[in-house]
Amino acid sequence: MKMQSNITKIIIIMSLLIGVGALYVLLSLSTPKKPLAGQFNIYEDKIKIGGPFELIDQNGEIFNSDKLRGHLSLIYFGFTSCPDICPTSLNKITNIVEILHQNKIDIIPVFITVDPKRDTPEVLKEYIKNFHPKFISLTGNEHQIKDVTDKFKVFYARVNSDNDDQNYMIDHSSFTYLIDKNGRYMKHFYLDISAKEIMELFKNE
């Protein structure tokens, strides 16, 4: 009975967090819907999203966002223990990057963890091998992760499981952010976008 009670509590907590997270993301990122192909509003409505950050990469080296300047980048926030949406999104990004590179569009994929406690540089280095070889994976301390997620309007919240300090999940928003060569936010999107649609962004660039 106690175990069933704990499971029920966890389900209720996760449902509440998902609801709050969805509301947060909708309020932070919602913009009028526009047709995708050929009609991107690149700096959509001048929403204040993104900004400079300093984290630690998968090699244990300090990584400053200035290193991305001169390149387009795709930034995704998640965590290595994520069972489904994160690997699905990273595989999608891998496919997009491959196609863009084939079309001579230089773009760097970036994975930023929202679970710095477990996602050390060593853990990230092994995990990111499953995806595009150009991926940069980043972690940091709690303050650094809070800073960069605030700048990108990313929602995330830890959900405890049986009070185990290592056995927990993280509920988080799941958008990919397209950043231009000057480090400016261009667009955010979910899994329903193609490399062709992204290429439409650069027709008049």
From Swiss-Prot:
It comes from the Bacteria. The lineage of its organism: Bacteria, Pseudomonadati, Pseudomonadota, Alphaproteobacteria, Rickettsiales. Keywords: Copper, Metal-binding. InterPro entries: SCO1/SenC (IPR003782), Thioredoxin-like_sf (IPR036249). GO terms for molecular function: metal ion binding. The keyword Metal-binding applies. This is SCO2-like protein RP587. It comes from Rickettsia prowazekii (strain Madrid E). Belongs to the SCO1/2 family. CDD domains: SCO (cd02968). Gene3D superfamilies: Glutaredoxin. Cu cation binds at C82, C86, H172.
